[in-house]
From Swiss-Prot:
The three subunits of the retrotranslocation channel (PEX2/prx-2, PEX10/prx-10 and PEX12/prx-12) coassemble in the membrane into a channel with an open 10 Angstrom pore. The RING-type zinc-fingers that catalyze PEX5/prx-5 receptor ubiquitination are positioned above the pore on the cytosolic side of the complex. InterPro entries: PEX12, Pex_N, Znf_RING, Znf_RING/FYVE/PHD. One of its GO terms (molecular function) is zinc ion binding. Component of a retrotranslocation channel required for peroxisome organization by mediating export of the PEX5/prx-5 receptor from peroxisomes to the cytosol, thereby promoting PEX5/prx-5 recycling. The retrotranslocation channel is composed of PEX2/prx-2, PEX10/prx-10 and PEX12/prx-12; each subunit contributing transmembrane segments that coassemble into an open channel that specifically allows the passage of PEX5/prx-5 through the peroxisomal membrane. PEX12/prx-12 also regulates PEX5/prx-5 recycling by activating the E3 ubiquitin-protein ligase activity of PEX10/prx-10. This is Peroxisome assembly protein 12. Pathway: Protein modification; protein ubiquitination. It comes from Caenorhabditis elegans. Residues 53-56, 129-133, 282-359 are cytoplasmic. The chain crosses the membrane at residues 25-52, 57-81, 107-128, 134-184, 254-281. Belongs to the pex2/pex10/pex12 family.
Length: 359
């Protein structure tokens, strides 16, 4: 009888490991939205800094893709190695588990494949999208049959095939998400399949392991071996160690909140709400709308320092790459965002064709 009671007491004293649950589809959508918003938020911030400090940040703005992939590689590698998840997955209390071994992808093939899908593929996809937009705009005003050579044929094939590839990837992802919602699949994205991992929620044991103090710094390990003076020093180093362990989490939270703030600023300054709040406050009657296409003969009659859109002295000179004409930054940015063409030549254009002139 006593043996049975003792066994039951031992069994109750051992706390069972918390069951690992998969995140809900709402958590996954929130995580993916945050992941896709980091790059444009940082790009907007760099663009803002390049406007005020061109000597320091202009090169970063022009080569943003390359700087960002280095930053993203360091960030994701740190979180995969230490927390077994990407930055945004860790922010929403998720972790990656290798499908074959059940271990976190801290090392080995799973971590390399995770870095490829988290960092490498978004960079390649962004470059391919830029190439597609550039080729499509160039050949909109030309006939494919007028261009000969293997290079032109490859470009034509790419322009035709790339939208279908993107559509196929989106269809596969949508099918996996539907299967995930119906509990028919343990993954919601093809990139998790390529990485060989699945997503799970962090457990209390995981959080405790992240904040664990090494054995040689634990107070209980040293109190029986040292003097009171050594114990005081040990508590001091223990607190320093806990501060160091908590510092990355604090920085990551501040970084994420900063991204939300940058998104808010971008929404306030680049949406119709901003236009409504900026106009009509002083009661002045707005000027009549400008003629949207200006002939080149009219441009030649203007002073060299006048903007072809507002017909005033240019502010923040900005050249349009597709035509070579120079405008005010505000004028040409609003025009291109609205009409997607050059106001003089009518050639297709977008904001990527704007070149700031710092003279």
């Amino acid at each position: 009888m006593s043996t049975t009671i003792r066994a039951s007491q031992l069994a109750s004293s051992i706390s069972p490991k918390t069951e690992e649950k998969q995140p809900s589809v709402f958590d996954i959508i929130a995580q993916e939205n945050l992941a896709t918003s980091i790059r444009p938020a940082l790009q907007h911030l760099v663009k803002y800094l390049a406007f005020f400090k061109p000597k320091t940040f202009l090169s970063v703005h022009r080569n943003f893709d390359e700087y960002y992939i280095i930053f993203d590689l360091i960030l994701q590698n740190h979180y995969l190695r230490n927390y077994g998840a990407s930055f945004t997955e860790n922010f929403y209390s998720m972790k990656r588990i290798a499908s074959g071994t059940g271990n976190p992808p801290n090392d080995g093939r799973e971590r390399i494949m995770s870095l490829i899908t988290l960092v490498g593929w978004p960079y390649v996809e962004n470059k391919l999208n830029q190439l597609y937009d550039r080729l499509k705009e160039v050949y909109e005003c030309r006939s494919w049959s007028s261009i000969n050579g293997m290079k032109a044929k490859c470009q034509k094939m790419f322009v035709i095939i790339w939208p279908y590839i993107k559509t196929a990837l989106k269809a596969v992802k949508s099918a996996l998400q539907l299967a995930y919602i119906l509990n028919r699949s343990s993954i919601h994205s093809p990139w998790l399949y390529f990485s060989g991992v699945i997503l799970k929620h962090l457990t209390p044991e995981d959080l405790e392991a992240f904040n664990a103090v090494p054995l040689h710094l634990q107070t209980g390990y040293q109190i029986s071996r040292g003097t009171l003076n050594e114990h005081i020093h040990l508590r001091f180093f223990n607190r320093i160690w806990r501060f160091i362990l908590g510092l990355p989490g604090i920085v990551s939270r501040l970084f994420a909140y900063g991204l939300f703030f940058v998104q808010f600023l971008d929404y306030m300054y680049n949406t119709d709400l901003a236009k409504l709040t900026k106009t009509g406050l002083d009661g002045a009657i707005p000027s009549p709308p400008h003629k949207m296409i200006i002939s080149e003969s009219e441009i030649l009659s203007l002073d060299t320092n006048k903007c072809p859109i507002c017909l005033k002295k240019r502010v923040n000179d900005t050249a349009l790459f597709v035509s070579g004409y120079v405008f005010c930054y505000t004028c040409i940015n609003q025009y291109v965002n609205t009409y997607n063409k050059c106001p003089v030549t009518g050639c297709p254009a977008n904001v990527q064709h704007l070149i700031r002139l710092f003279v």
